[in-house]
Amino acid sequence: MPTADETAALVRAGDVRASARLMRDLDDARPGAVDVMKRLYPHTGRAYVLGITGNPGAGKSTVVDALIDYYRKAGKRVGVVAVDPSSPFSGGAILGDRIRMQRHATDDGVFIRSLATRGHLGGLSRSTSDVVAVLDAMGFDVVIVETVGVGQDEVDVVSQAETAVVVTVPGLGDEIQAIKAGILEIADVLVVNKSDREGADRTVRDLTHMLELRPHEAEPVEIVRTVATMGKGIDELAKACERHRERGARAPEVEPAAGANGPTSERRRRRALATVREHVLDTMRRAVDETLAARGELVERVATRALDPYSAADELVRAITRGRADE
């Protein structure tokens, strides 16, 4: 079994087998995976992370497939993290993005990884940020994160992506209302896919009107028409994303806190905060599960009304805190 240092070196060298094994270990929360990530983190931050989200049926995977083509023709290596709904029985991803994008399977410059949401309240599984970091450390130029279409939970994509792309299509009926419900506020680029359909002009007008209602200081959001199945508009989409990235690079930097390597952008700081918060919550969830397993009598006492759940929760927190203090 390779050490954490050896695994990190293999990942940085682009070893597919070692990287895939690490991704699996991260998804399964296996011991030792975090030690490897600690060694990889200083070598991340180079890839362009692009988030693709939107309503079910909008053609997100087709857009991703077309973007892979675009970036590969430009000589870029592309990693894809496709977050799927979980099977309630196996916990596995059931949409099968590898099947949808199987024509890229023999391309060494493309790596596609499906992740299951495992009931996570946001559209992203708990290990998504780590998998993105692995692909980054492997040397991929672009990492595309495609999320499930679950409404407002799509805001999770912002914590992972430099540019968030929201995809909609004409004819869904309530697609604009769904965007009003919260997705619009996270969009850096809006895509009207299947724009050869009737109603595309109206969808673009409605989106334009909604953007006009935003605060004047809000960042500009471009609207791009695509027909992803034919590759139409994909060049324009990629260029719109690049313009957003360039605007972010020119954004004012925030003064560094004590101990930081240097100034950074507010957006990058927010992404770092979201990542740290997710790992703290993940650590606490595991601690709760482990403590509950060891203190099964607490649940029994609550179930029989011998103890109220509020006091049980307080006792659980005290047990976790004592355990952490003893480490």
Predicted regions and their residues:
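Long, well-ordered amphipathic alpha-helical subdomains in the mid-to-C-terminal portions
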Residues: R225-A228, E236-R324
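The Walker A (P-loop) glycine that initiates the GxxxxGKT/S ATP-binding motif of P-loop NTPases
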Residues: G54
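Canonical P-loop GTPase G-domain recognition
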Residues: V189, S195-R247
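Alpha-helical scaffold elements adjacent to nucleotide-binding pockets in ATP/GTP-utilizing enzyme cores
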Residues: I94, V131, D156, Q160, ...
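Flexible active-site lid/hinge loop adjacent to a nucleotide/diphosphate
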Residues: V157, P170-E198
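Generic beta-sheet signal
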Residues: V81, V167, V192-N193, T226
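Nucleotide-state-sensitive switch-loop elements of NTP-binding domains
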Residues: T3-L50, A58, V64-E175
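A general structural signal for well-ordered alpha-helical segments in protein cores
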Residues: A4, S19-A20, A33, V204, ...
